[in-house]
Amino acid sequence: MMGPKANAAAAGDLPEYAEVDPTGRYGRYNDVLGKGASKTVYRAFDEYQGMEVAWNQVKLHDFLQSPEDLERLYCEIHLLKTLKHRNIMKFYTSWVDVSRRNINFITEMFTSGTLRQYRQKHMRVNIWAVKHWCRQILSGLLYLHSHDPPIIHRDLKCDNIFVNGNQGEVKIGDLGLAAILRKSHAVHCVGTPEFMAPEVYEEEYNELVDIYSFGMCVLEMVTFEYPYSECTHPVQIYKKVISGTKPEALYKVKDPMVRQFVEKCLATASRRLSARELLKDPFLQVDDLVFCPGDGDYSLMNYLRQPYLEHAYSNVSMMSNGLSESIDEDTPTEDRWDCEDDDIKADGIDLFNGHEDEPLGNVDITIKGRKSEDGSIFLRLRIADNDGHVRNIYFPFDIEADTALSVATEMVAELDITDHEVTRIAEMIDGEVSALVPDWRPGPGIEESQDTTYCHNCGSNVSSCGSLYAYMSSAARGCQCAELHGRFEEITFQANGEQTDLQDSGGSSDDGGGQTQHVKDQEAVHSNGFVQMGRRGPPDQFCFSSFQEQSCSPRHYEYDTSLQAKGFDMKHEVKMAKYKARKMAHLRRAIHPSLDFDNLNGERRMKSSLNKLQSFHIGKNHNFRIPTCERSPGARDAEEDPDIFNLAYHSRHPDPGAQRARHCEVDAQSSPDLMFTARSYYTGAQLPTNLPRTKSVTLNAVDA
């Protein structure tokens, strides 16, 4: 047992604060992080948040003889208080210490110092990392320049850009020389000569001077040389800048794209691009580059970056007829993205997913879970953006076999999720599971042992349909982890917007003519292995329809007689399809007993005028057409033709273009009245992991 003396001795071993703020929250150590002409930055500690911060201290006597400097300091503090951006240094608080005649303000601390120090420390940096830094700096500048009136930094350089190396993020700081452009032009000549634009010397400039300084920062990042280092006096720099002579370091840049980008930043003010325009420059469009893993590289990063796909391709498999059994380089494949090894070695691999000019804060990610009586856990991940697009992803979680990181990685691999970090989703899963199971211990999601092998059939870089197609293909039948595929059910809807049109681009009616139908009371939602039919109702009410609601009593079948000669048993295949549909309906009814299917059928029978033929695709070879529901007897016309079921036989490897034509295209702007939601979803039993799944399902609306 430790006595008071022992406690005092232990406390004496701890480093003592050199200074404490008036509230007692922040304590300053004597460790100096940086020192300038009039400001010293110390290491400090936030006792409330339990994190290290930067204690900026300025001596007041340094400004007593210079009111302009004092005003500039107050300007910096005021700006830091009002600016809130992920690429601008965070400001916490400030105060004046009258007794010590100091002005103190607390900002976030950067673990890796300035960008110049960080770049000199890490000499071997791929050009894609430089692009990533450039996008972040431009994003911060765009935020400053978008104010009304605009805010210009006026002293942007690598010494005023700070880095958190463990996250690869850079932020703009040291806004002491920043000015609010209250008029059309600023009228002061301030800054660092090597980074000052020619118009600054003429004291007639606008926010584009920051773009000129940014170009010099890029030049320093790629050459490790300070701009105009060949000059020995500021006057020499002034003469070169005024005459339009570029620094010699620019001509040492061998990459033509880098050099061209820097020249755009250093152009004359009338031709210089803005931060918004530079963010759209092809040089910085790293997200449009194709990601191709190297030889045998199947690490976690393969999931973090997926190629960008057009909206029309988001719900369709991109696998071609030459689906390979592996992704080894020596195996010829037609579905793999084309990448040359020389390009990979020269440009590296893009590990930075998401658009840097679109803050992740605009995307709201929440998770909710439920634990059943038998101990099984079912989770819902909700992803919503500012445009009202909502994605609900439902999946079971096995606390004995699953880890949060492995489930998150599998989710990114199967679903079209490219804008969210795997680690962030994994942390949310860990937190929710820990709340449901107090004894749960988070662990790593990937076993980093030599015996652990990566399943080549799991790594689909295309879309959720692509992963499902690969799973159901012959190449994946022997896959050891194939039972994990299809665990996710995704429901998407629009929180607000215009009316949604459902188009059938590939189906044909009974008369053979392909027509486009606008479905106003139902919406088809694609997911991995299931079909959900949307009905009229508010977005906060959810329901799942079953295949039993689909009438499966065909009057007669039409098919090619040549199939019989090939040994194709049509009756057997139809019976199997009907059995699978009924089986799926029973499972749905058992899993979600709280759903009022009778009431739902009643609502659909009331809409007899909208009795459409639906099409669902089971497997790779057969396409059946079934009616959505049976009309009430009073609603049928005497002259109406009987429902016809058309059956078409497809080849073993269907054309991806034909598959895309059969998918319904949903307009991006959806009506709230047409939203598909899930009512009382968590009141049902948990979804078993061994639930039978169809291979792929599509819904098309055609004329009845």
Swiss-Prot record:
Give the family this protein belongs to, as stated in its UniProt record: Belongs to the protein kinase superfamily. Ser/Thr protein kinase family. WNK subfamily.
Which organism was this protein described from? Answer: Oryza sativa subsp. indica (Rice)
What is the protein's name according to its record? Answer: Probable serine/threonine-protein kinase WNK1
Per its UniProt record, what SMART domains does this chain match? S_TKc (SM00220)
Kindly give the Gene3D superfamilies that the UniProt entry links to this protein.
Answer: Phosphatidylinositol 3-kinase Catalytic Subunit, Chain A, domain 1 (3.10.20.90), Phosphorylase Kinase, domain 1 (3.30.200.20), Transferase(Phosphotransferase) domain 1 (1.10.510.10)
Query: Does the keyword field hold ATP-binding?
Result: yes
Domain Protein kinase as annotated: residue spans: 27-284
Q: Which InterPro entries does the record associate with it? A: Kinase-like_dom_sf, Prot_kinase_dom, Ser/Thr_kinase_AS, WNK_Ser-Thr_kinase
